[in-house]
Amino acid sequence: MTSSEIAMPGEVKADPAALMASLQLLPSPTPNLEIKYTKIFINNEWQNSESGRVFPVCNPATGEQVCEVQEADKVDIDKAVQAARLAFSLGSVWRRMDASERGRLLDKLADLVERDRATLATMESLNGGKPFLQAFYIDLQGVIKTLRYYAGWADKIHGMTIPVDGDYFTFTRHEPIGVCGQIIPWNFPLLMFTWKIAPALCCGNTVVIKPAEQTPLSALYMGALIKEAGFPPGVVNILPGYGPTAGAAIASHIGIDKIAFTGSTEVGKLIQEAAGRSNLKRVTLELGGKSPNIIFADADLDYAVEQAHQGVFFNQGQCCTAGSRIFVEESIYEEFVKRSVERAKRRIVGSPFDPTTEQGPQIDKKQYNKVLELIQSGVAEGAKLECGGKGLGRKGFFIEPTVFSNVTDDMRIAKEEIFGPVQEILRFKTMDEVIERANNSDFGLVAAVFTNDINKALMVSSAMQAGTVWINCYNALNAQSPFGGFKMSGNGREMGEFGLREYSEVKTVTVKIPQKNS
């Protein structure tokens, strides 16, 4: 599922009048959503934090408080790690469980997510500000597919026999690492929760996971579904809290064997340092990006404009994959800018629960201010502000879709990850030039190229210093393909078969035998 292809029912028409007439075909948000789960989830039980502290959870569309959630700190992390270690101990129910049964539990969890899909999508919109239909058709679709994908892998992770010299029989085993600490971001709360727990549980690990303090509600709801699905106590523990306390405790905990983090490069560095200083726990990092999107003159212009638009503005621009450095070949530059501005001006910004809304609010006041400050830096440094550039409305954290032209590589908006609805359009003359400029970044998460020349496409894709390259598409992510970054965009891979390698150890076993026969 891609950001620009929301799979709505076929009967829903494309033109606005027909769309409004057929809205009854679309799913509806859960009315008067009750927030049931606001406590820490340890050992399949809901608990108050040891400190008794709570923190507010807000609706970014209004700025108003939704509820308060128990705040986990180091003491609570210690309790969760103890529960996870007990669940992982030799002879435990979880360790003795058949791999096929682990797969069945993941499939059952997917069934429960499908049952509660509208409720979870409502929660993602209420707590995270994303349009409900995008949450329902993209985020929740990704959650379900990821759970089912790894459910299918559970009993298919095989070792091998190795023909070594001498009278020996040698084979390998793929074993779970142990207790996995996981820290997830606020931009895709439920999807990132699933990206983390699904491969870990598939391999037989146990989990201590911290959702972002801005968006803990859907992760806590998943705790109830995990218990209902039948996962044993202690296998998954969910602890909402802040990075400097709960997150730091996970990163440095001696009882945690592996950590996976999605978030900023700055915090990723701190986590890798803490992992090294403590017990050299294994680390997977999915960090920031400043991704190049290269548009050649022979591309389908209307299609490239729409894909580039979605590649930046999807999810309010709050994507690590955002194609925010759009390099356009000189001969089509002015026309591309013109059409991009027209498209941005048509983008509908509004309530996440309005079915016509394309863009909701930024996550909070801090992020809102950061985006507006970077927009002002673009103006100050000489980029041409084609449209947008301001906050929108009296309530909430909405920002106008913003387009800059005449952007140069040395500007802050061309170098720093904005994480907001801001499109920067740069021009280039030659392939060699654009390859060098596209790679001239500390980041290397994704890249894209739009062209009708397959030789040009393959040449550029092989030259890009990025973990994923899209040709004539953008944000085409799926459960089957590995995802991760080069350079300061992180290390390790999530998703696909490669994602399993991050959650298992390979053990070699050699047996002395009386006589070997080939």
UniProtKB/Swiss-Prot annotation:
Biological processes annotated in GO: 9-cis-retinoic acid biosynthetic process; anterior/posterior pattern specification; blood vessel development; camera-type eye development; cardiac muscle tissue development; cell population proliferation; cellular response to retinoic acid; determination of bilateral symmetry
Protein localization: Cytoplasm
Catalytic residues in the record: 286, 320
CDD domains in the cross-refs: ALDH_F1AB_F2_RALDH1
InterPro entries, alphabetized: Ald_DH/histidinol_DH, Ald_DH_C, Ald_DH_CS_CYS, Ald_DH_CS_GLU, Ald_DH_N, Aldehyde_DH_dom
PROSITE patterns the record matches: ALDEHYDE_DEHYDR_CYS (PS00070), ALDEHYDE_DEHYDR_GLU (PS00687)
GO molecular function, one term: retinal dehydrogenase activity
Pathway named in the protein's UniProt entry: Cofactor metabolism; retinol metabolism
Predominant cellular place of this UniProt entry's protein: cytoplasm
Residues modified to Phosphoserine: 351
Transition state stabilizer, annotated site positions: 187
SUPFAM superfamilies hit by this protein: ALDH-like (SSF53720)
UniProt keyword terms in alphabetical order: Cytoplasm, Lipid metabolism, NAD, Oxidoreductase, Phosphoprotein
Function recorded in the entry: Catalyzes the NAD-dependent oxidation of aldehyde substrates, such as all-trans-retinal and all-trans-13,14-dihydroretinal, to their corresponding carboxylic acids, all-trans-retinoate and all-trans-13,14-dihydroretinoate, respectively. Retinoate signaling is critical for the transcriptional control of many genes, for instance it is crucial for initiation of meiosis in both male and female. Recognizes retinal as substrate, both in its free form and when bound to cellular retinol-binding protein. Lacks activity with benzaldehyde, acetaldehyde and octanal.
Protein name: Retinal dehydrogenase 2
Organism: Mus musculus
Lineage: Eukaryota, Metazoa, Chordata, Craniata, Vertebrata
Gene: Aldh1a2
